[in-house]
Design a protein with these regions (language model features):
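NTP-dependent small-molecule kinase module
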Residues: 2-5, 21, 25, 74, ...
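P-loop (Walker A) phosphate-binding loop of NTP-binding proteins
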Residues: 10
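ATP-binding Walker
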Residues: 13
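Walker A/P-loop
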Residues: 16
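Post-Walker A helix-loop "phosphate-sensing" segment adjacent to the P-loop in P-loop NTPases
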Residues: 24-35
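Conserved nucleotide-sensing/catalytic segment adjacent to the nucleotide-binding pocket
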Residues: 30, 39-82
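A glycine- and Lys/Arg-enriched "phosphate-lid" helix/loop adjacent to the NTP-binding pocket
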Residues: 49, 97-140
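Short, well-ordered beta-strand core segments
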Residues: 78, 97-100, 145-147
Length: 167
């Protein structure tokens, strides 16, 4: 039976890097990036003058869960990563392993300020991103199997080892 691995954490915590590494190193694995299931901006709530990507309402959950189910029928390992990785109870219940990547707030702010994907972001918005993470990172208080703080790529193989030991 295919294994579902959920990887959650705040923006810039290393979720995508970890999932990409695991997809390359685990046999017959696929990486699903939650960002690929964001709704069109006009359907997402706003905060001040900005699209609020930091709310679970920004995700097309129906399409995302359908993709996960389809992938579980096609791969040995399905790696779902995103800021809302633990938001969906059905996925939480199906998951074989839940990995949380944490960053101290100061490190998050430094990394996010360097991010230029959306241009320079105002400080109030960075604070909003952090607060939204605290609210939405694990709303169901799901038991997390592995937690890493400020993970480094050299530690990725430790997670791979744990995954390969799953029954």
């Amino acid at each position: 039976m295919a294994k579902l691995i959920l990887i959650g954490g705040v923006s810039r915590s290393g979720k995508s890097s970890l999932a990409q590494y695991l997809a390359q190193h685990l046999p017959h694995a696929t990486h699903i990036d939650q960002d690929e299931f964001v709704l069109p901006a006009q359907q997402i709530p706003k905060i001040n003058d900005r699209t609020d990507w930091e709310t679970p309402e920004s995700i097309d959950w129906q399409q995302l869960t359908a993709k996960v189910k389809e992938s579980l029928n096609s791969y040995n390992y399905v790696l779902l990563e995103g800021i809302f990785a633990f938001q969906n109870e059905a996925l939480n219940n199906r998951a074989d392993l839940k990995v949380m990547l944490k960053l101290p707030k100061e490190e998050f702010l430094v990394k996010r300020r360097k991010e230029q994907r959306w241009g320079e972001e105002p400080e109030w918005f960075l604070e909003h991103v952090w607060k939204a993470h605290l609210i939405h990172c694990n709303p169901h208080q799901t038991a997390i199997d592995l937690t890493f703080k400020s993970i480094q790529p050299k530690e990725f193989s430790k997670i791979q080892d744990k995954i390969e030991l799953l029954p």
